[in-house]
Amino acid sequence: MKLSDFDFDLPSELIAQYPSRERDNSDLLIAVTPPIKTKFYNIIDYLKEGDLLVFNNSKVIKAKLNLGENITINLNQKLSDDSWSAFAKPARKLHVNDEFYFDNHKVIITEKLAMGEIKVKFELNDISVFEFLNKYGEMPLPVYIRRSHSLCHPVATTTGSKTYLNNDWIPWSNHGMTNTQNDNDRYQTVYSQIEGSVAAPTAGLHFTKDILDKLKAEGIQATFLTLHVGAGTFLPVKTENIHEHKMHTEYCSITPDTAKIINKAKQEGKRIIAVGTTTLRTLESSCNNGIVKAGSFKTDIFITPGFKFQTADMLLTNFHFPKSTLFMLICAFAGFKEMHELYKYAIKEAMRFFSYGDATLLCRK
């Protein structure tokens, strides 16, 4: 298939610049015929006793560092205890062996690669890299969140001949809060545990502890795996032949207990619901002859139409970029034609896209 097959027109005003007022107050689109638009807090109405939700419990680290002189780096992947790959902006201002000081701690540029990628080493005094980042770093919000732009403060969205009031989301300043304070909270799932992601597994951002408690009370199970989301998740596909695209690699882990829970549910005919594309990619990467294997590994799995799924029956996910690997994934999961039609409906209904946007619940075709 061609890259252009996965294109669609997305009005820029539908790119969410802020999350909804409350986590579970975002919209949820149920992919049935015709589609059902509801609120996320109603998700329990579309699940049933015995269902198994599989979550990604990776925790977003404060991976963005300001080096001064308008230079920033965004960490990408851990290479060793003190070394990381990163993306620099602008990379041309950096040189190998450049040193940057944060009080009595030091960050050293050790290698320059292509496309703005670099390698850095941390020389720290009595603290870990994660402790250093918690003190000096910032949440690595995606580049399409541009709050200095006029899009930051909309009171309504116009799509075609229709205008929709955005009463459920407003800038942080209207709450008497700062961007930093609230992104630290809202760009993180309530169940995150294991530090390592440099972008949020966004499908999980809608869940509250109250919803998780209600799901448990209804006999809906939950289990957790880990995929540390890398910055490569935002890299565009540049080849018209999609199969020439080289996927980024990401670290994954599935515990023996989690694998046992998933395999037992499958054997009993229970529905497996992957919360997010990161969860689905981890499950499919670990699966052999229908059995999910425990272990820690790296994956560069690239899921496109024609892929034979072995694990999840349903997928909860946000709305994705045109021509992105994630839109290709959902077309593979729920149908190429069906997803194009669903996205047309979502755009007509002025649903919000990307990390801080709305969610959709898909059934495997």
From Swiss-Prot:
Reaction catalysis annotation: 7-aminomethyl-7-carbaguanosine(34) in tRNA + S-adenosyl-L-methionine = epoxyqueuosine(34) in tRNA + adenine + L-methionine + 2 H(+)
EC number: 2.4.99.17
Matching SUPFAM superfamilies: QueA-like (SSF111337)
Keywords, ordered alphabetically: Cytoplasm, Queuosine biosynthesis, S-adenosyl-L-methionine, Transferase
Gene Ontology molecular functions: S-adenosylmethionine:tRNA ribosyltransferase-isomerase activity
Known function: Transfers and isomerizes the ribose moiety from AdoMet to the 7-aminomethyl group of 7-deazaguanine (preQ1-tRNA) to give epoxyqueuosine (oQ-tRNA).
Protein name (database record): S-adenosylmethionine:tRNA ribosyltransferase-isomerase
Species of provenance: Rickettsia africae (strain ESF-5)
This protein's encoding gene: queA
